[in-house]
Amino acid sequence: MSAQNGMYYSLLEWFKTLNLNAPHANAEELSDGVALAQALNQFAPESFTNSWLSKIKSSAVGSNWRLRMSNLKKVVEGVYEYYSDVLNYTLQPDFAKPDVQAIAEKCDLTELERLLQLVLGCAVNCAKKQSYICEIMCLEEELQANIMRALQDLESSTRQSVEGGGVVSSMSRNSLSNMLEGNTKAQEERDAMAQKCFETEKKMLLLIDEKNNLQQELQKIQQEFARLELNTIGDDGVSLGPIQAGSVRYNELRRQLELVKEELLQSEGAREDLKIKAQQQEADILHMQQRIDELMKTTAELTSLKDEVDVLRESTEKLKVCEAQLETYKKKLEEYNDLKKHVKMLEERSADYVQQNAQFEEDAKRYANTKGQIELFKKEIQDLHTKLDNESSKNVKLEFDNKNLESKALALQREKDSLLKERDNLREAFDELKCGQLSTNSGSLTGNTVSRELQPAAMVDKIQRLEAENKALREGQGGQTALAQLLDDANKRCEHLREQIKAANERILSLTHASQSDDPILKENELSKQIKQLMELNEQKTLQIEESSTQNSAMQCKITQLESTLSTREQELMAYEVKYRKCVEKAKEVIKTIDPRIASGLEANILEKSIDVIEEESKTKMSTMEEQLMTSAYYRLGVNAHRDAVESKLALLMGSGQTFLARQRQSAPRKSLTTMKSK
């Protein structure tokens, strides 16, 4: 294990302790990102959800480094979002973002070390951080030191938005570092004491074995001494006999006894030495046990301190939450004070509105009095309408009779002119025919002195045709029979023409007699008198209509003023109602936010009832105002229609003495602006 990659291997050993489904034993297995995603899901399932985990492609990754890179990108983005959104940490630019491409292609250990460092920060700051910290504490000391260094590096490169530290708070960091140092020292002392205890136990076992051996030798010597004291014969037949001074046996026993005494002295010295050593070792064991008890107490204190640190962390978090709640409550208090002031203002405004409503009611009563006057005017207007309709019908009849008489007079005049022209023409034709007959009787057919220009067109045609026939007869040298027939035909035609001339003369005479007997001048005088009378009547009616129109215009001005005041009052009432509702809703919200127990149901019911009463009053007022507006609009429309009808009839009466084309050339009467506005 190199010094550069020591932190990576320590983080990998910690990562191996996690219970994951995906393989996570080496860098190649971690480079696909599946195990890292499962670990994040295990740390914070509320942030790294199962739907997010399903986006990580676990199957068909293999050696495809692009798929591995996409998985690692998702993991890195999720970790950064967790740091910024959930933990409220921002990583400083000196902490480089892990290179996903290098991990996916080359399994770069330094980049993978950064990624594992970020995952470690997530584990230390998640909801189950106590269990993961305990697992880290159960690792070896070297691994713990590397992991602690990784956490310190991550903490130095993070910056929290709210005051209070990085990944681990300053207070907990100092306490953890002190606890780790004390724990390492205690473990070293525990190992040294255990080694000493093991050595002393070995020495104790050796001394016990030596003691047992010495006891066995003593027993053997005592048995030999008892055997020698007996007066028995030995196996070689020599009588051992009693022990006497100077005997061989006595000397041997004396020598053996001295040897045994020396050995006893040596064994007693050794025993005393061993006793002293045993006492020293027992004292050492007692001291070591006391030391172990002290270390156990320190470990218990350390665990209690860890618990206190966790409690302090939770209390700091709760304190932050409480501070935030305090700020919100302060803001709500300020809003409540503002709302109190606003409610006072609204109460004053509501009092003003009540006074204004009373004034509006008085105005409505006044308008009710004016309503009776308007109805009287309406009845008068209706009577005038009926009179005007009758007069207009009479005028129409007179106009029609006048037009018929004028048309008859014009027709008679035209017929008279045409008859006079025909009479003159017939006289001329008659004179010419007389002259023609005289010329034929004398035998000079060609010597006609009558000018053809004075003859009528039909006679000229006939004469030309007869002359052509005469020429044809002369040129063709026909028989006398043909000439006789032609002469007979010509005579018949002349007789027919004479009969026509006689009938025309008779008709002229009858027409002249009729024209003289009818006397059209008298009729024209009578018609002119009737037209003058009708014009005088029309002028009287126009004067009456103008007077009624002036009265109607004055009434319309009053009605428009009243309608404008009513519309302004209605708009003000609507604005006041909207403001009142908003204020009531704000007051309800304020009462609910202050204390829901104060805002009882009775007060809410009272407020709702008052609101309903005000709404009903406003609806009734609005309905009465709408009815008044409808009646005024209806009267205005009737007056405008009546005025238009009168103006059109007056225009017709004024143009009755003119021709049809002259009346068409005249401009139509313009409609008033009030009618255009009302439409």
UniProtKB/Swiss-Prot annotation:
Cellular compartment(s): Cytoplasm, Cytoskeleton; Endosome; Synapse
Q: Which GO terms describe its molecular function?
A: dynein light intermediate chain binding; microtubule binding
Enumerate the CDD domains for this protein. Answer: HkD_Hook
InterPro entries xref list: CH_dom, CH_dom_sf, Hook_C, HOOK_N
Q: Which GO terms describe its cellular component?
A: centrosome; endosome; microtubule; synapse
Q: How does it assemble?
A: Homodimer. Interacts with microtubules via its N-terminus.
* Notes on the domains: The coiled coil domain mediates homodimerization.
Report what the protein is called: Protein hook
